[in-house]
Regions:
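Nucleic-acid substrate recognition interfaces
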Residues: 1-250
C-alpha cells in the first residue's frame, strides 16, 4: 500500500508538471519547476528526494526530446517519424518510478530503511519504508556505497522491483590476453583466445527450440484471446504474461 501510494503521487506530480510544460506555462528547467511545484498537494506525500528526482527526471526527458528534435531537423532519415514529447504516466501501465537518494537511505540490522514524508508516516503509522535484505544481497553489495534506490514496476509482470544503485571499484586488468566472441544461432557463440589454442562452441539449438516454443504458444493464446474480445480490446492474459516472463528469464 505504501509503494502504491508513493507511486500514485509521484505519477500525478509528473503528469501535472508535464501538462504545464506542454501548454507552454513552464519551461522544463528543474530549478524553476521545483520552486513552483514544491507546495503542490501531492508533494505532501513525497519525501523531498522523491519530489526532486521526479522533477529532475521530467526535465531530463524534455531535454532529450529537444535534442532529438534538433537532430531530426538535421538528419530526418535517422528517424521513423517526428520525435514526440514526453508522455504522461498511467498508473495501470507505466507508473513513475520512486527514487530515493543516499541521503534518504539507511541500513540497520540487515534492513534497508527509506525515508518517508511526515504525511506518509502519519497515514501508515510507520517510521520508514523497510525492506529486509537477504544475506546474499548483503554479501555482494557494500552498503556504504549505495547511491540510490529505485522502486519500479515492470510492465510485463506488473511486479514491483527494488533497484539498488551502488558504486563498485573496477579491478585492474593486468593481462593482455584477448577473447573473441562470434555470436550465432545454431552455435550460440564461438569463442577463441589470443594466447590459447583452446576454442569453444556453445550449442544454441536448445535455446532456439525453447524460444520457438514460447513464441508459438504466445501466438496461439493471443489468437484465442483476440477471437474472444476482438483485437481492439485485446490485452495480455496472465498466462501470456507468464510465458513472456519465462521466455525472458530462460
Amino acid at each position: 500500500n505504501i509503494i502504491r501510494t508513493l507511486s500514485y503521487h509521484t505519477s500525478k506530480l509528473y503528469n501535472i508538471v508535464n501538462y504545464s510544460i506542454n501548454k507552454g506555462e513552464n519551461k522544463p528547467l528543474y530549478t524553476k519547476l521545483d520552486e513552483q511545484f514544491r507546495n503542490n498537494w501531492h508533494c505532501d506525500f513525497l519525501h523531498s528526494h522523491n519530489r526532486q528526482h521526479c522533477l529532475k527526471l521530467l526535465a531530463q526527458n524534455w531535454k532529450s526530446y529537444f535534442r532529438s528534435l534538433n537532430d531530426y531537423k538535421k538528419n530526418p532519415s535517422k528517424y521513423k517519424g517526428i520525435p514526440k514529447s514526453p508522455k504522461y504516466k498511467y498508473l495501470d501501465s507505466n507508473p513513475n518510478e520512486i527514487i530515493f537518494t543516499n541521503y534518504a537511505i539507511r541500513i540497520k540490522n540487515g534492513n534497508l530503511l527509506l525515508s518517508l514524508s511526515k504525511k506518509m508516516k502519519s497515514m501508515y503509522k510507520v517510521d520508514n519504508l523497510k525492506f529486509e535484505l537477504s544475506d546474499k544481497v548483503q554479501s555482494f553489495i557494500n552498503m556504504d556505497s549505495i547511491q540510490q534506490v529505485k522502486i519500479k514496476r515492470e510492465s510485463v509482470s506488473n511486479r514491483w522491483y527494488l533497484i539498488v544503485v551502488y558504486n563498485k571499484e573496477c579491478k585492474e586488468n593486468n593481462g593482455d590476453n584477448v577473447m573473441s566472441i562470434d555470436p550465432g544461432l545454431d552455435n550460440l557463440a564461438a569463442i577463441t583466445f589470443k594466447d590459447s589454442n583452446k576454442n569453444y562452441l556453445i550449442n544454441g539449438k536448445p535455446l532456439k527450440s525453447k524460444n520457438a516454443y514460447y513464441n508459438k504458444e504466445i501466438a496461439r493464446l493471443s489468437s484465442i484471446r483476440m477471437k474472444q474480445v476482438g483485437s481492439k480490446k485485446f490485452k495480455n492474459t496472465n498466462r501470456i504474461k507468464s510465458l513472456r516472463i519465462d521466455r525472458r528469464n530462460y
